[in-house]
């Protein structure tokens, strides 16, 4: 599981940063990539990475400002032109369906794969046997959402060495034991399967925020996550601009991470006014509140390692 930032700027593209898009690489988990937002030229950014468009399985849109959606129609078309045939799911606030369908229709773009567009409000917007994704409304003037992505706990591994020490040979009985069943061996020995399975492996948790002012919904979404991705459009001394334009400062993002007890904070959506050493200053501002901070640049990647069952 890896976060790969494709665009980390705010508002409009700049020489150093493209507009918003971040990929959640789930290649080991499900052979797929999920995309969060798709600003202008996202597909061009993808060309500089190992991401294969046909492996993009789901796209989650935080809100309908252009710097978060203008790259979507082009990416959908290119995915088809490049041989993508598997279904693609797009999730977004009300209006995303009209935007996508109109862009594809007016441009005469025909897709070779099934496209499913789901408009959501708050609550669980996706769940399967591996993951659950929850959305909450943030504070950005027009509807902007944050996402909490939770990997479900994995079953514990079978304690094979302990079974072999008891003379239990590999075979179908191992599956029974792994399911926690009580089994009786040929010699009458009773095996309680629950005692021969390691504790479950704790799933990983990520929170990815759309554009927002500091708000309680961000704290709730980020509760206990391994990684919080939060916008930091402005420096701490420009809180008045953050308030007026419905954005956050570095310190406000750090406050969310601290209150939520997140393990790591990654800052993104950085104004082009901050260059070079000024970006280092943004990190230092956040660290006065929350120590484990990184500032994302385009093509930054962050691995999210699964901890042991006793590391919560």
Swiss-Prot record:
Gene: rnz
Family of the protein in this entry: Belongs to the RNase Z family.
Organism: Anoxybacillus flavithermus (strain DSM 21510 / WK1)
Catalytic activity: Endonucleolytic cleavage of RNA, removing extra 3' nucleotides from tRNA precursor, generating 3' termini of tRNAs. A 3'-hydroxy group is left at the tRNA terminus and a 5'-phosphoryl group is left at the trailer molecule
GO molecular function, one term: zinc ion binding
Stored SUPFAM superfamilies: Metallo-hydrolase/oxidoreductase
Lineage of producing organism: Bacteria, Bacillati, Bacillota, Bacilli, Bacillales
E.C. number: 3.1.26.11
Database matches in InterPro entries: Metallo-B-lactamas (IPR001279), RibonucZ/Hydroxyglut_hydro (IPR036866), RNase_Z/BN (IPR013471)
Gene3D superfamilies in the cross-refs: Ribonuclease Z/Hydroxyacylglutathione hydrolase-like (3.60.15.10)
Residues the record marks as active site: 67 (proton acceptor)
This protein's name: Ribonuclease Z
């Amino acid at each position: 599981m890896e976060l790969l930032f494709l665009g980390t700027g705010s508002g409009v593209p700049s020489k150093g940063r493209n507009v918003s898009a971040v990929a959640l690489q789930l290649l080991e988990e499900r052979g797929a990539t999920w995309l969060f937002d798709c600003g202008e030229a996202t597909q061009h950014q993808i060309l500089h990475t190992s991401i294969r468009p046909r492996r993009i399985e789901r796209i989650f849109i935080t809100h309908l400002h252009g710097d978060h959606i203008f790259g979507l129609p082009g990416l959908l078309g290119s995915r088809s032109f490049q041989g993508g045939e598997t279904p693609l799911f797009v999730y977004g606030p009300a209006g995303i369906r009209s935007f996508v369908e109109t862009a594809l229709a007016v441009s005469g773009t025909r897709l070779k794969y099934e496209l499913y567009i789901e408009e959501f409000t708050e609550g669980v917007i996706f769940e399967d046997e591996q993951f659950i994704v929850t959305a909450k409304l943030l504070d950005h003037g027009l509807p902007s959402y944050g996402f909490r992505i939770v990997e479900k706990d994995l079953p514990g591994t079978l304690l094979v060495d302990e079974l072999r020490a008891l003379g239990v040979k590999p075979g179908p009985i191992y599956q029974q034991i792994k399911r926690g069943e009580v089994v009786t061996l040929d010699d009458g020995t009773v095996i309680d399967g629950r005692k021969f399975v390691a504790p479950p492996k704790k799933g990983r948790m990520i929170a990815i925020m759309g554009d927002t002012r500091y708000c309680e919904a961000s704290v709730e979404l980020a509760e206990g996550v391994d990684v919080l991705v939060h916008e930091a459009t402005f420096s701490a001394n420009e809180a008045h601009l953050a308030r007026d334009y419905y954005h956050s400062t570095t310190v406000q993002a750090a406050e969310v991470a601290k209150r939520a007890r997140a393990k790591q904070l990654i800052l993104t959506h950085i104004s082009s006014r901050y260059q070079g050493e000024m970006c280092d200053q943004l990190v230092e501002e956040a660290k006065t509140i929350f120590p484990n901070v990184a500032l994302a640049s385009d093509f930054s990647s962050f691995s999210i390692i699964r901890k042991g069952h006793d590391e919560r």
